[in-house]
Amino acid sequence: MAAVAAEAAATAASPGEGGAGEAEPELEPIPGSEAGTPLPVTATEAAVPDGEADGRQSAPQADEQPLPPPPPPPPPGELADSSEAEEAKPPEPAAVPVSPPEQPPAAPEQPEDAPRPPPAPALVPPAGGDSAVSHLIPGSEVRVTLDHIIEDALVVSFRLGEKLFSGVLMDLSKRFGPHGIPVTVFPKREYKDKPDAMQLQSTTFQEGIEVKQEVNGAVPDDLSPVPPPERLWASKPPPLFHEGAPYPPPLFIRDTYNQSIPQPPPRKIKRPKRKMYREEPTSIMNAIKLRPRQVLCDKCKNSVVAEKKEIRKGSSDSSRYEDKKRRNDSVATVNKKLKTDHKVDGKNQNESQRRNTVVRVSSIAHSRGRVVKVSAQANTSKAQLNTKKVLQSKNMDHAKAREVLKIAKEKAQKKQSETSTSKTAHAKVHFTRRYQSPSSGSLPPRVRLKPQRYRNEENDSSLKTGLEKIRSGKLAPKPQSRCTSTRSAGEAPSEKPSPSEGPEESAGEVQDTSRVRVPGEQEELRMLGKKGSKSSISVYLTLNQETSDSSSASVCSIDSMDDLKSSNSECSSSESFVFPPGCMHAPSASSTSTSFSSKEENSLRNSLKMKIFSKNVSKCITPDGRTICVGDIVWAKIYGFPWWPARILTITVSRKDNGLLARQEARISWFASPTTSSLALSQLSPFLENFQLRFNKKRKGLYRRAITEAAKAAKQLTPEVRALLTQFET
């Protein structure tokens, strides 16, 4: 059995021969067995190239060759290398005659329990601790004990005196080490701190075999074995990095410090090339994409543009001079009229009233309803005043206004008996401009009232300034009344003093005020108007005490006579002014207020009367056939912002009194934002259906957060939840 194991180890030591693979099935030694016999090295080297060597062929060679004397021992540091060299030589014991002759060489894989004979004492130095180890030299043969058999490896141990050495013998015939690590040619080991005589041989197995054969006389024609090793040691070491160099095996690295081990060339590190020149500032600015920002909405932008235009106009010297002159003339006229002309002839007033174009609009189709009368003036260039003059006219003296109030009360009491035969109680509203419906076109150069959708303090002030526009020229101390009007939203009453009006001046400017007489003992005279430069606007409202109830409401829709003739539908307004009962009273009026015939008055009522009813609903159908419900998740668009997801809070449907649809609006709350907006339903689109069309992949941050919240809300809005939200009509 020992001979079979030695033969298998000898075959495994030859990596380059074709017969190396045949030794693999023979590698079945028994743990605990010993390998090593007193055979010369030349016998082993000569048997390796054949690949089919057995004990019978090597036996005669062992008999013929005498044992060489033991060489000098190597230093202790070379013990590991000597062990490797010795592990490569155990195949010689194949010729030991102890092996049974009846065992055929074709079946060496069968286990044998025959004990191995002890090695020759000439090869093993005497045991003596360090002195024994010092006797070992490279190439000497030792006996090792087989401890473990691992796949493609053997674990052996070697005892020398008191010292015990162990190691692993690998099968190099497969040219692969354990765990798939490739085993390559032994690297050349160079110890810088040792002389060349102490260096280890790093040639391939084939070269080593040929050299040993020459030394032992196996090749008769070449008897100089020393020069080849000198040539090997004198050659330059292989470069550390060259193409195709394999990685060194791991078992050789730990013993090869400060040595040149063949390695592949290092990988190239790609580094970006630095630009040596600095970029010009123009190219940097071109790389920055500038996007226009819409900071202001349409309303704010229009107001800013209007203010800029007014500033430009006011900057010119001529406009400043004209404005100053008009203010001085108006103040002088008021002072003059207050001092001298306290009583005005009714005849002159009647004449000036007849010259005006008067339109009376009835708010409710009842005989006792309130009537709004509008007196329009000729369109003259002098009568067109801007907002700047209105703001300037707010700073008039209040003391003069009190005098006007006293005169107005006296006049009203005096004229009350003259017009007691009046059939109905009328309220007159004097405006210098008309309302405009949202669908109407552009208007002549008169100031337009913007529709006030939301009731707040700003809109309240804009209404006041709108009622305080000025048209007429020089003023006279005409008795006026005071009226407290309240809007439908429940705002606080706005009271404004009105300048007195006088007869027509020679300049051709026409008075635009008239008086309305209302029968009743509890009438209180009040005035709504504004004291301004060259003209005034007065709103006179009366309340019939007998027909006053909480359900009555008046709608004020006003236009001039010439506009009525051209387009009756243009006069309709979408805004309603509701005057609660008991809060307004009208002054006395002259008999000329009934100058229109009843037929003409009825036609004007029918043409101008228009009311819009609004209702909050939970579900509505748009003109394009889509059904929108409260709680739906939609896409909404506001100028200056991208399409943004929102949730519908309320839906308001407005219709005219004839049943036609006026508008459909929705109050929405934006996702990822605390704000709400009111938009038309036509500007909304479903969220999930139009997601691919509206979603912008390039936007990040708050936009993505809003999209995420809207997607979660849309998933939760199932048809059942939608049905619950819309089952009750509000």
From Swiss-Prot:
Modified residues (Phosphoserine): S82, S99
BP terms from Gene Ontology: chromatin remodeling; positive regulation of transcription elongation by RNA polymerase II; regulation of transcriptional start site selection at RNA polymerase II promoter
CDD domains named among the record's database cross-references: PWWP_PWWP2A
Region (Interaction with the H2A.Z/H2AZ1): 396-547
Superkingdom, taxonomy of origin: Eukaryota
Biased composition (Low complexity): 1-15, 488-501
Domain PWWP: 630-690
Residue numbers spanned by region Disordered: 1-134, 257-276, 311-355, 409-531
Any GO MF annotation of the entry: chromatin binding
Complex formation: Component of a MTA1-specific subcomplex of the NuRD complex (M1HR), which is composed of PWWP2A, MTA1/2, HDAC1/2, and RBBP4/7 but does not contain CHD4 and MBD3. Interacts with MTA1; the interaction mediates the association of PWWP2A with the M1HR complex. Interacts with H2A.Z/H2AZ1. Interacts (via PWWP domain) with histone H3 trimethylated at 'Lys-36' (H3K36me3). Does not interact with CHD4 and MBD3.
Compositionally biased tracts (Pro residues): 66-77, 91-108
Pfam families: PWWP
Biased composition range(s): Basic residues: 267-276
Gene it is expressed from: Pwwp2a
Chain intervals for the UniProt region annotation (Interaction with HDAC1 and MTA1): 128-346
Alphabetic keyword roster: Isopeptide bond, Nucleus, Phosphoprotein, Transcription, Transcription regulation, Ubl conjugation
InterPro entries for this protein: PWWP_dom
Protein name per the record: PWWP domain-containing protein 2A
Role description: Chromatin-binding protein that acts as an adapter between distinct nucleosome components (H3K36me3 or H2A.Z) and chromatin-modifying complexes, contributing to the regulation of the levels of histone acetylation at actively transcribed genes. Competes with CHD4 and MBD3 for interaction with MTA1 to form a NuRD subcomplex, preventing the formation of full NuRD complex (containing CHD4 and MBD3), leading to recruitment of HDACs to gene promoters resulting in turn in the deacetylation of nearby H3K27 and H2A.Z.
Annotated Gene Ontology cellular component terms: nucleus
Biased composition annotated in UniProt, kind: Basic and acidic residues: 311-329, 341-354, 512-527
Record location of the Glycyl lysine isopeptide (Lys-Gly) (interchain with G-Cter in SUMO2) cross-link: K188
